[in-house]
Amino acid sequence: MNEFDKKPEFLTYQSDKMENYLYDYVLSYDGKTSKYINNYFGWDNSHSNNLDNKYSGKAFRPSICILICTSLAGTLEMALPPSISVELVHNFSLIHDDIEDNDKVRRHKPTLWTVWGIPKAIITGNSILVLGNKVLNEMLSNGSSKNDLY
């Protein structure tokens, strides 16, 4: 692990909250790609050398989302749904990028496509994108305005 793999200290609290929210949200999804999504995030024991099975992303983007929201008089609770949406969309792009670039390792473990094959990796990435969009749609259906999302 080098200095760029570590989470900046000031982001730890926000990213820990986001990771817990992300975990709960994704685990509530019970679709055909659930097992592949859980594998990708390291929340299972298969095909992973991540000993504590904790999500190992730096969570920089969602932490910035949380910091912006809270600095504009929002609360952490208000910021969590859009922050995980940002993280889900980012991870969708990483799965597809790994395939395009023929990358075999991400976050110190085999990439999704090398473990499960390209078709399952593409569908799993797409499912993660759908989850990211679903979070925002749920905010709108729960009374948030489009302006709240910006």
Predicted feature residues:
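A short hydrophobic/aromatic micro-motif that marks alpha-helical segments and, especially, helix-coil
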Residues: 45, 112, 133-134, 141
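Membrane-interface starts of transmembrane alpha-helices
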Residues: 79, 117, 121, 145-150
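Inter-helical turn/loop segments and adjacent helix faces that build the functional surface
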Residues: 71-75, 135-150
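Short amphipathic alpha-helical interface segments enriched in basic and hydrophobic/aromatic residues
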Residues: 90-94, 133, 137
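Conserved N-terminal diphosphate/IPP-binding helix and adjacent helical/loop segment
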Residues: 1-89, 95, 99-114
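Multi-pass membrane catalytic core of lipid/isoprenoid biosynthesis enzymes
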Residues: 114-134
